[in-house]
Structures are given as C-alpha cells and as structure tokens.
C-alpha cells in the first residue's frame, strides 16, 4: 500500500502533460518566429511599439502595394485587437508576393503568441497559427501540365 500512496502524490498524467505557454522574449524585448507559405520563408521580430511594420527594409505598404496583401499581413493584429501596439520587422525571401504575404502573416502570428501567450486562443481560432501546406502540384510526364492532357485529335 505504500507504493499506491506514492503514486497518488505524482498527480494525474493530464496535469503533467499540459504545457504552460511561457513568454519567449530576447534581451532586447523582442520575440522571434519564422513563417512559411508556398516557397516563401519569413523571419519576423515583434516588440512593443507604435505600430510600424517593416518588410525587407521598406514600409509594408511600399513592399506589398496591393491592398489585399496588406490586409492579409494585418489580419493577426486586427483579430487580436492589438492594432498600433507592436513594431514588426520582417525579412522574407522566396516565392511571389502572395506567398510572401502569407509567410509574414504566419510568422507574425507565431511571434505574437511568443510575445503575449494569452493571444494564442484567439489566433488559433482564426486559423493564423496553422501552416498552409498547399504547394504547387508537380508536372507529370505525358501531360501538358500537372493534370492537363495534351490536345487529342480523333481524326
């Protein structure tokens, strides 16, 4: 019976398995995360500030000229109701503009959860923390494209 009492002291397995989300910030008060989308990879730093967003050394409105891409980039901040509270610096490489905007959005969402773990449930519910795994399907031999066949002539 002494063995059973020592087992009760350990607690249930669910208590031990639940990870506590801890704030991850470097010595300069920034949180860092990487985001990916298609062929693009973004490195994102988030710190408390006035709401500046810089992508590859330019203001995000200059780098992503299309309003749709700017909206994609700002979605996590708007969903978390933290507009104008963070300075965001991102470097992104590879892919096209749409993939790069998605990569920065993914990295920004992860960095926000590291900076402020309480935002995790809101961002998870919005689907911002999930890596979008859709990539271009490869071309197959005997086909014109990935699925399109060559033109067929009956006669």
Swiss-Prot record:
<dbReference type="InterPro" id="IPR014721">
    <property type="entry name" value="Ribsml_uS5_D2-typ_fold_subgr"/>
</dbReference>
<keyword id="KW-0687">Ribonucleoprotein</keyword>
<dbReference type="Pfam" id="PF00380">
    <property type="entry name" value="Ribosomal_S9"/>
</dbReference>
<dbReference type="GO" id="GO:0022627">
    <property type="term" value="C:cytosolic small ribosomal subunit"/>
</dbReference>
<dbReference type="GO" id="GO:0003723">
    <property type="term" value="F:RNA binding"/>
</dbReference>
<protein>
    <recommendedName>
        <fullName>Small ribosomal subunit protein uS9</fullName>
    </recommendedName>
</protein>
<dbReference type="GO" id="GO:0003735">
    <property type="term" value="F:structural constituent of ribosome"/>
</dbReference>
<keyword id="KW-0689">Ribosomal protein</keyword>
<dbReference type="InterPro" id="IPR023035">
    <property type="entry name" value="Ribosomal_uS9_bac/plastid"/>
</dbReference>
<dbReference type="InterPro" id="IPR020568">
    <property type="entry name" value="Ribosomal_Su5_D2-typ_SF"/>
</dbReference>
<dbReference type="InterPro" id="IPR000754">
    <property type="entry name" value="Ribosomal_uS9"/>
</dbReference>
<dbReference type="InterPro" id="IPR020574">
    <property type="entry name" value="Ribosomal_uS9_CS"/>
</dbReference>
<dbReference type="GO" id="GO:0006412">
    <property type="term" value="P:translation"/>
</dbReference>
<comment type="similarity">
    <text>Belongs to the universal ribosomal protein uS9 family.</text>
</comment>
